[in-house]
Amino acid sequence: MAAKPEQDCKTAAALIRAGSLIEGVESAGKDFLVWTTQGPAVKKDPDLLFSLCRVLPGSTQQTLKLQQVEPTADSQELTVQAKEVWQANPGIDPLTYGDIGGLPHTNEPCVLDFLARRYQSKVIYTTAEPLIVAVNPFQDLKNAGPDTIALYRDAPDVDKLPPHVFYASRRAMTNMHQLKKPQTIIVSGESGAGKTETTKMLMKYLATSAGGNLDLKIQTAIMAANPVLEAFGNAKTVRNNNSSRFGRFMLLDVAREGGIQHGKVVAFLLEKSRIVCQDKDERNYHIFYQFLKGAPGHMRQRYMLQPLEAYTFINPHCLDAPGIVDTEDFEQTVKSLESMNMTETETCTIWSIVSGVLLMGNAKPTGKTEAGVENAACFVGESEAALRNACSLLFLDYPSILHELTVKTTYAGSNKIESRWTVPDSEMLRASLAKGMFEQLFLWIIRKLNADIEPKGGSFDVFMGLLDIFGFEVFQNNSLEQLFINITNEVLQRNFTDIVFEKELQLYSKEGISSKKIEYTTNEKLIETLLGKGTSVLAALEDQCISPSGTDEKFVSSLASKLAGNKCFIPSKNTKSLEFTVVHTIGKVIYNADGFAFKNKDVLRPEIIEITRASTNDVVRGLFEGVKVEKGKMAKGMLIGSQFMTQLKGLMEVIQKTESHFIRCIKPNDDKVPLKWVNSKVLIQLHALSILEALHLRQLAFSYRRTFEEFAAQFRFINLGVSNKPGADAKTICVELLKSTSISADEYALGKTMVFLKPQAAKMLVRLQREALSAWEPLVGVFEGMTVLKRAKQLSTGRAVPATRICANVRRKLVQAGIKVC
């Protein structure tokens, strides 16, 4: 389900970065355009976020008087503060710019307006170097056919072609084979943004050989498994009804001439806590609803299925998802399992485990005093029956599982000591068993797929990697899941920042410019705040989860104490509140720690893993294959947070060995209709996908770069005396144009073929150019009048008056420009 419009508006508004004196007002102060959040149109439709206004006389750098001109003209005069104003890019044709970074201003409203106008012209790809931004068109634009593939595959210089996902494919393939280095194309975005379609397009390009042949074997195998992976790994969240709750990394063996020869799928960071609890407006994984709604009578009986409302692990407040027909999807999942060469026994085991995981939630322990332990866990009545049936469905020995859920075993040296688990302890063990069985079943399905598509030995010398992963998440209620997802994105952001500046250094080196002029900051301090040893958010959570008396309240209190004075962390002003704020790369995110400790405790004891390995079922025996067990120890490594960090570390180790390319997918509206653009919806994603951050990183050094010829042509009107100097080459003109301004030498650099400018220098040149052109405005009306006279061929003596005026004005302007006149 899409997020409520008012929620998007509030979230987007909170993310907007304040304007500034520099961006808000120019010293000329003459009738120029700006964006503001205070326009009448925004008051009427908050989704707009910004409206375009004209600055009126009487404005100062602190306070501006405005009049709205877009989306509709309004005579109302506004008085706003500079922090509520952002400069616009008047006169810019968005179709002539392939790279957002080439715009004079790249503030939030300018980027939104630029992308919106391109999108409404059906131009969905844009560069925000080194990113490619892809906006979901919700229609077939016929831009991915054989002709388009051939255009990008065969072009002598692909850099001269418009932005496209095929550009990323071509560049990655070329680098892979020429440099013999693995490549990764990272595709990110929220559900519905077009990640799946983008990945399919990338695979289509990679599978097409230079001779026009299409090798569909591996692509078909992977796509056939996609409904199964989505059923087990996707769920309805408050923002999206088909949200991928895991990261997917595909390794592809691509021939030099094109064609996918082998492949492998690796799953990262499955959101296990969702299996046992969901927020009010969210669902569990799709597979549960497909099975319970779509299974025929004989399956319902065989797998002991009950109504949805009967299961504790199913949120009763959200049983359906708009746009999803669970019964139809169940049929598709069944067909996909068959296409994956599953045996009948394997398929039956899958359904049995799915049912058993759900039923395990109904096995609720109750307390009694036993062996000197108050509230000792035991299972009686319906709970005992549920546990017995769940074990049967999971192919686990019931007496053994019952023992592990009620009897606590510890070791003192070689001595074995038994006592009783309390009810809360038993509930955590039961939940961990359910989560572990489901997660390992999901991974087993992927291993089964890989057995059919990966090369012999399972290793790749050089590969093309496709990473499909979620971006930053900012909800109205942000829990442990959002914290883990946002930590993942911060780590990816650090990698991204390193790559951006590595490319900057390469360009500077090529152009002969000192890299000492690059100044930038990283999110290293933030990552240390989130993940550092001893004093960090994750460390504090792990400490509380290990402690017998640990609670969410103590966790939040510990954070406030340990991170006091840390600029990346803001405690709640209410000491009784479970909320805390982290200052992420994308802005401030408020987390609610209610349930953090419970969600993080994934204490699947070694004894329980050993029970699965003693199962009579072949599939169940192999579920925990490769999982190390060590009896008698309960450590941080068993917690979800630790497992998450292990997987994240593994993902980054793979990515860092490759050369990365980035595609950011944008969902322009929740209605999935063509040409509809919702600013509030898009702005959240621009932050979440680090698109604005990419532009910000470029602003930190010489963000503007043009060839000498392009620079001389763009800013020729600043000083016509220099621009029209006879015999001067482009570089000489550039140097003299810059010297004729007040721009200091440390604000620009001259390379071998290009001019590099810092952001404020580029903005000053734009202003000087506009002032120069504005000074010529009196001549416009005169020339228009002369044109009319000429066309009418009126040869009266009255014509001499406008001619005289023209000559006088032209002579005056030429003298001002330093051009000698007779």
Swiss-Prot record:
GO terms for cellular component: cytoplasm; myosin complex; plasma membrane. GO terms for biological process: actin filament organization. Residues 95-770 form the Myosin motor domain. It comes from the Eukaryota. Coiled coil: none annotated. The keyword Membrane applies. ATP binds at residues 189-196. GO terms for molecular function: actin filament binding; ATP binding; microfilament motor activity. Keywords: Actin-binding, ATP-binding, Cell membrane, Cytoplasm, Membrane, Motor protein, Myosin, Nucleotide-binding. Belongs to the TRAFAC class myosin-kinesin ATPase superfamily. Myosin family. This protein differs from the typical myosin heavy chain structure in having head and tail domains but no discernible neck domain. This is Myosin-D.
